[in-house]
Amino acid sequence: MSRYRGPRLRVTRRLGELPGLTRKASKKSNPPGQHGQARRKRSEYAIRLEEKQKLRFNYGVSEKQLVRYVKKARAQEGSTGTNLLRLLENRLDNVCFRLGFGGTIPGSRQLVNHGHVTVNGKVLDIAGYQCKSGDVIGIKENKASKKLVEGNIEFPGLANVPPHLDLDKPKLTGKITGKCDREWVALEINELLVVEYYSRKV
């Protein structure tokens, strides 16, 4: 399953608010599809699937990528669910989003893919790069790159930069100072249900 490129509001109507995917909110309260039908009680599988889809669409990863992250999270010490969220939060495109360099994760991914972002002083165009403590994320030294980011950083997608990121707004740089705490994940998600979803699949 590839990365989603369809209407974003259609997804948020079905799954709820996804701050990484879009800043817009749907004016329609009903989920997409036919209406007026009696709502059936959802199965446990359907609930787990929905939580998994929230992660996929919010962070903009493919099913194949998410499976790899789940395997990696399992291999690490500690809670698999927390490890999974941290792996997704540490993606370069997401770090750029949390710093305010891009208004959404897709917007931040475009900045990375087009060579506007640096890691430790070198241009890096790999959106899925796993940022680590001590990494300094910056913007390429040219007018076009800086102009793109300066417009975004004045109106960031999320109001607050999490405490594990140290933003130097005038210099357009951010340093990773530690691990992302669970409470600072900007998505309403039950990560344990995601882990359960993959328990028999991975």
Swiss-Prot record:
Compositional bias of kind Basic residues: 1-13
Subunit structure: Part of the 30S ribosomal subunit. Contacts protein S5. The interaction surface between S4 and S5 is involved in control of translational fidelity.
Pfam families assigned: Ribosomal_S4 (PF00163), S4 (PF01479)
Gene: rpsD
Keyword Ribosomal protein: yes
Protein name, entry field: Small ribosomal subunit protein uS4
Record-stated family: Belongs to the universal ribosomal protein uS4 family.
HAMAP family with a match to the protein in the record: Ribosomal_uS4_B
